[in-house]
Amino acid sequence: MISDNARAGMQQAPARSLFNALGFTPEEMKKPMVGIVSSFNEIVPGHMNIDKIVEAVKLGVAEAGGVPVVFPAIAVCDGIAMGHVGMKYSLVTRDLIADSTECMAIAHQFDALVMVPNCDKNVPGLLMAAARLNLPTVFVSGGPMLAGHVKGRKRSLSSMFEAVGSYAAGTMTEDDVCEYENKVCPTCGSCSGMYTANSMNCLTEALGMGLRGNGTIPAVYSERIRLAKHAGMAVMDMYNKGIKARDIITKDAIMNALTVDMALGCSTNSMLHLPAIAHEIGFDFDISFANPISERTPNLCHLAPAGPTYMEDLNEAGGVWAVMKELADIGLLNTDCMTVTGKTVGENIKNAVNRDPEVIRPVDNPYSKTGGLAVLKGNLAPDGSVVKRSAVVDEMMVHEGPARVFDCEEDAIAAIKGGKIVEGDVVVIRYEGPKGGPGMREMLNPTSAIAGMGLGSSVALITDGRFSGASRGASIGHVSPEAAVGGPIALVEEGDIIKIDIPNMKLELDVSDEVLAERKAKWQPREPKVTTGYLKRYAALVTSGNRGAILALPGEQNA
């Protein structure tokens, strides 16, 4: 056992005295020590129930012959951090979570791990740690929130953000907004649509790192407690069989996850996190991989914000495995990949059933013949940009309009709510990238304001920042290279014509190469927005959005 390094032999007698202080018995010190990574806190609705999940995991581990030991991971609520300086501190926690989990696991010589995440950066951060540490590892999330109900219709947090925009447009009263405020988030859990947290929890299943239902069983269901017990048992089965994280997180598994991503219509943030997870196993994931997969993968689900269904509906329809069965039946998945069940993907999903063909469309009747995401390139984004095309209305799939340029999110929001943005405009928000932000803030407030003002079918938004999974419309993010390093987005001027062609994966600035060269010669880097603390170090180490905003030493950032 790895844990013998910390517990066995005369040399470790001092360590055993400390285990005695923890209450360990001699019998327990002879059993595998399983770290339970708990992201419980009392500030994130998706994490307030995780203490109960952790207790269930502990019972499962002990039942199967292991000794469970809990240690913490941090988690930020993106909804609470949204629209102010706090959003600079969201994406950056992903790497803190990965690094701190690595430190705890190796310092204390755990034999296996159960990760208990739920929200946006917590899930990919722990997936990165799992791949890096390569121990027997199982994931069990806290689960999604139930949808709210307003005036007889299901609603969620994205509805709340758009209600604020509608109030600014004069189409909602303060009482209307208050009703949304009190009803859209009725339970604990990760917000109820196919936003980033639920996207990543579903993709954890697709990767093979979570048991069936990990991404979809609602947080308040007792079924999730049973799932957590089974996760504890499963990690001991993996330990006994010698199955480790990198036996599961492989290149083929990551490509499976990307395929499922397209079918589900996941958050654009998956195009930051999958490259980062891939990096941990030495797989150079190019975001352009998304396009050929998207071209052959039908979009089968239109969960909020793309449509009127929610995670509870996907769960009732058969969940992620039912979606995977649809894809496997037409040869789009590698079904030989290993999973935490000790079985292959094919063995797991062979009896999965699609119980609701409106929530999960059959492959012969998809919402669209192409997947939910697209990577756009052109002279405005030479290294790529990302759009959730499953949430773009038909009339905005091809668009041309004048640039309305803003150097920060706040200025753009003021212009949108002030009525200064009109039909046909292309809002450009720059210097919000990984380095420029720093921290690559989500632009949910601007996109929600555009939708709430009634401009969602006529105005596009382009940024070197990123978007919440709750954003919809022609929202094109992760523009790379970013403005802070002199990318073409830094050279856009007010009124320049921008051409968007999502079907052909093009994003072009209608300005000649000669003019762009003249502008580039005059361009000067901006002074850093943050000069102290973690964000200063992060800005120095972070790479571009097209590389997953992974951290690298300065000499390796363009590798």
From Swiss-Prot:
Lineage: superkingdom: Bacteria
Protein keywords: 2Fe-2S, Amino-acid biosynthesis, Branched-chain amino acid biosynthesis, Iron, Iron-sulfur, Lyase, Magnesium, Metal-binding
Pathway membership: Amino-acid biosynthesis; L-isoleucine biosynthesis; L-isoleucine from 2-oxobutanoate: step 3/4; Amino-acid biosynthesis; L-valine biosynthesis; L-valine from pyruvate: step 3/4
Reaction(s) this enzyme catalyzes, per UniProt: (2R)-2,3-dihydroxy-3-methylbutanoate = 3-methyl-2-oxobutanoate + H2O; (2R,3R)-2,3-dihydroxy-3-methylpentanoate = (S)-3-methyl-2-oxopentanoate + H2O
Protein name: Dihydroxy-acid dehydratase
EC code(s) of this entry: 4.2.1.9
Function: Functions in the biosynthesis of branched-chain amino acids. Catalyzes the dehydration of (2R,3R)-2,3-dihydroxy-3-methylpentanoate (2,3-dihydroxy-3-methylvalerate) into 2-oxo-3-methylpentanoate (2-oxo-3-methylvalerate) and of (2R)-2,3-dihydroxy-3-methylbutanoate (2,3-dihydroxyisovalerate) into 2-oxo-3-methylbutanoate (2-oxoisovalerate), the penultimate precursor to L-isoleucine and L-valine, respectively.
UniProt subunit comment: Homodimer.
Keyword Transmembrane assigned: no
UniProt cross-references to Pfam families, sorted A to Z: ILV_EDD_C, ILVD_EDD_N
Residues carrying N6-carboxylysine: K121
Coiled coil: none
Organism expressing this protein natively: Agathobacter rectalis (strain ATCC 33656 / DSM 3377 / JCM 17463 / KCTC 5835 / VPI 0990) (Eubacterium rectale)
Family the entry assigns: Belongs to the IlvD/Edd family.
Residues annotated to bind Mg(2+): D78, D120, K121, E442
